[in-house]
Amino acid sequence: MTPGAAGRASFGQSAASASSLKWAALQDAAKVVAGLAGLEPERTTPEIRNFPALIRDTAPWRRELAERGIDDMAAVMEPGIAALLGVNARGADPRAAALTLWREFTHARAAVLALLPPSGAMGPRRSA
């Protein structure tokens, strides 16, 4: 364990694995929200699917911001989905609230994805 930014501990590979799991869980949660909003299922782009691996190879400041963004998205999505499921269970229409949560999520996800450096026509930079 090494000290991270702002007094947070950085656990190296295990932190990357935890972020990867959170990222995948967020994408699954987004599918639920989209369904409750009445939207068609979103196609997962390579950028979204490969984000954890791509961000792992970037500068530490990008990884730290991505981890914070992922944590922030989870902090919004968890209670949001719980509320939407509660509304749906009572027989009320959750579409308007779900659409609002969906838009909030997609904007936050776009901001996190923007942390990836440009990859160019040859794909992301790789180093041995």
Question: Model regions: which residues?
Answer:
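Short terminal alpha-helical segments
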Residues: 1-55, 106-109
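Polar low-complexity intrinsically disordered regions enriched in Ser/Thr and small residues
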Residues: 7-10, 15, 38-41, 72, ...
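Alpha-solenoid helical-repeat scaffolds
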Residues: 16-26, 41, 45-48, 67, ...
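Amphipathic alpha-helical binding modules
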Residues: 82-128
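Amphipathic alpha-helical interaction modules
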Residues: 31-86
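Intrinsic-disorder/low-complexity coil detector
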Residues: 2, 37-40, 51, 59, ...
